Every structure is written in C-alpha cells, then in structure tokens.
C-alpha cells in the first residue's frame, strides 16, 4: 500500500480545513492503493457518509493535481485497512528496466512509493494537528510597558514551564490591547522550545462551533479526545461562552482534564473573571485558580514606543514629536494606534510628502475630530459620577469625604490622560481648583493604581467606557 499519495492529500487538507474538523473526520481515514484504486477506510458508516458528502470533491481535486491523467479510482469502505504480508518483488527483465529509465521524469516523480502507513511516523505526526497560531506574533515584537508588564512576565514564565508556572493563566482587558498577541507569543515560544508540543489556539466561538457540530454528528468522543490531548490550549475571548450551557459543561470537563494532566491553559477575556455574566460560578472560580492579570490601555510612553516600533517595521522614519502627537491624541488601544499609523504611512506613500505634525493632522483629521468629540471633561465627569453613583455636582463641590474625593481625583486623572486640556483648564472645570490640586490628584491615582486592585480595576473600566 502506498502512504505517500494519501499523505500528500492529508497535508493539503490539513491546510484547508479547520483543525478540529480535520482531526475529527479526515485524520481517522486509512488508505490502501491497489490496482490503481485508492480505497479509503472509515471507522464507521456515519464517518464514511460524512466524508463522502463533504470532502469527496476536495479529495478528487487533490488526486487530479498530484496524479494528472494517472488518477486512481476512488472508493470508500467501512472498516480498517487489511494487513497483509509484503508481496515478493516481481522479477524484472532488462526490458522493464529500460522502459522505466526511458519514462518521462514527471511520470516517475508522480509514481507512488509503495510502503506501509507506519513506515513514515514523523510525517504522520506532522499532520496530526494544526496550531492556528500566527507566527508573526512573538515576544520579540511585543512592546512592553507598565500597562502590560506583569502580563508579559507571566506569559514568558508559562512559555518556559508550561503546565507548572501559572495554570490557568487568565489575561483580561479591553479590545486591542495585545492579549491575542501574547497568546500567540506563548504558543510560538512553547513550540520553539519543544517542536513536538501540541499547542492549539482558537477563539471561544470556534470551540462552541466544533462542539455543536460534534453533537449533531454523534462524534462527541472524538471532540473530547482532540481537546484533551493537547499540551497547551489557548482560548481567546472566553466571555463568548456566556449563556451557552452545553458548551460550558463540556469546557468544564475539558478544563479539569487538562489541569489534572498538567497541560497548560491560557484564557483571555474583556473583563475580570467574576464580572463575566452568563458563565457558571464553578467555571469562573476555576478561571482564577492560577494567575489572573489585567492588560491595561497603554500609557503615553508605551503608545509612543509602539508607534516607533511599527514605523521601524515599515522602514519609515517617524520623528519623536510626530509619534508623541499621535500617541497623545489616540489613547484607547494598540489596534487604533496601528490603524492610524498605517493610514499616515499610506498617505505619505501616495503623496510623497514628509511625515510631519501638520501632515498627520491632515491625514487623521476625521479620526482626531471624532476622538476630541467623544472624550471631553464634561463626558468624563458624567461617566465617573454615574459609575460611582454620585452626582456631577458632587465632583465640582468642596466636599472632601472619600466617597466623593476619590472619584473626583479619578476624574481629574482621566481628564489629564484622555484630553488635551492643561492642568489649569482641568482645575477650572472641577469647581475652579488650582492646577497643583489636579497634579496631586494625578499622582495620587497613579500611586493607588499600583497599590489597590479596586482602583486599578475602576480606572481600567472607566478608560474602556470612555474610549469605546
């Protein structure tokens, strides 16, 4: 039997199909090539019908591509490939040898090599799963700052010692802050350290879709085996499990099985585990068994560093003052920064003009106008007052009770971070306070964000609300 032809088909199908779909339906097939007939053996009638219905055209196309006019007949059977003793090689005459040597090289290259499936275990192992990881996302090109420092350090430790350092590792924060980049970076580093590691990255919705498909097709055991056999499971946006009870039930058992096997789990969400609504308490409790780390919006210095790094990747010189101008005005997330820089670079390429502050102001005029319109001191005051269930008048008053003073300090710090107003202007907007009061408030909040988890959470939540 020849494994090389079917192996070629498998390798290409793995590239074309989702990882779980390939593992569930295509990988279990066994193949035998005899008398120009390729027979595919399925473990049961259900799998046979499913493969023939869903993948026949793809398999036929690949056979045509690899064999040309010599395409073998294709048939399907239920069962296992028969194991037979190797046949003795036929006696070859000088004419046979001459005929083979004179055959076109292309046909010789296409001719299958007859050997058993198990003769090439490394090749088979190579197609057993697909990680879905983005090779471009590495630790080397992740820009570190105070906002993501702890998350990056934890991710590095997990990649060096998966299943033992922090398990699970739970990263949370707003959209576009680098959580997905860190997931891929961990996965890529694990594989770099151990090329045989089975690491799978996916969005939580993909897990749900795979489970639903498995239930519909009576293949839940294959589904379980696949997900519980990985060395590291990286799931993005776990909050999409909300209100999906059957998916939560299955993930609960998968989670337990992986932890018992010291297999690494890394999850991300847009909010703290206990704040995820629609998810069972037993799952939320398990999310916090390892290490939970917040990824916050990047501070000004990190935003500047991100812009400089991205410009360098594009081989574009970006002056410090230009990077500062963009970073000062676009504060919500990394994705927004990258999008703005891409637009600036594209405009510069189209027009041939140098990238100056005036050029950036023109290229991003609609984006900058929208940002200034969305985030105002008035809007900040209303949002903070609503968040703490007090009145805007309280923020402007002379009251010094902690229930009012702390929200007032937070609002001042947010005004400094999210607007272009000067300290005196911010002080005037808060009941005519002196600029030194605003400066003290900003420094106090910066200190509390380091010391108090609650203040850190409140600040991140307000930033996310105001920037969305």
Curated annotation (Swiss-Prot):
Molecular function terms from GO: ATP binding; ATP hydrolysis activity; DNA replication origin binding; lipid binding
Region of interest (Domain III, AAA+ region), ranges: 132-348
Pfam families in the record: Bac_DnaA (PF00308), Bac_DnaA_C (PF08299), DnaA_N (PF11638), Hda_lid (PF22688)
Subcellular localization, as worded in the UniProt entry: Cytoplasm
Region (Domain I, interacts with DnaA modulators): 1-84
Annotated region described as Domain IV, binds dsDNA, given as residue ranges: 349-468
Residues at which ATP binds: 176, 178-180
Location of region: Disordered: 80-106
Keyword vocabulary terms for this entry: ATP-binding, Cytoplasm, DNA replication, DNA-binding, Lipid-binding, Nucleotide-binding
One GO term of the biological process aspect: regulation of DNA replication
Principal subcellular localisation of the protein: cytoplasm
Spans annotated as Domain II: 84-131
Tree of life domain: Bacteria
Cystine crosslinks: none
GO CC, alphabetical: cytoplasm; plasma membrane
InterPro entries listed in its UniProt record: AAA+_ATPase (IPR003593), Chromosome_initiator_DnaA (IPR001957), Chromosome_initiator_DnaA-like (IPR020591), Chromosome_initiator_DnaA_CS (IPR018312), DnaA_C (IPR013159), DnaA_dom (IPR013317), DnaA_N_dom (IPR024633), DnaA_N_sf (IPR038454)
Record's subunit section: Oligomerizes as a right-handed, spiral filament on DNA at oriC.
Domain remark from Swiss-Prot or TrEMBL: Domain I is involved in oligomerization and binding regulators, domain II is flexibile and of varying length in different bacteria, domain III forms the AAA+ region, while domain IV binds dsDNA.
Function in brief: Plays an essential role in the initiation and regulation of chromosomal replication. ATP-DnaA binds to the origin of replication (oriC) to initiate formation of the DNA replication initiation complex once per cell cycle. Binds the DnaA box (a 9 base pair repeat at the origin) and separates the double-stranded (ds)DNA. Forms a right-handed helical filament on oriC DNA; dsDNA binds to the exterior of the filament while single-stranded (ss)DNA is stabiized in the filament's interior.
Similarity comment: Belongs to the DnaA family.
PANTHER family in UniProt: CHROMOSOMAL REPLICATION INITIATOR PROTEIN DNAA
Protein's UniProt name: Chromosomal replication initiator protein DnaA
Lineage: Bacteria, Pseudomonadati, Pseudomonadota, Gammaproteobacteria, Vibrionales
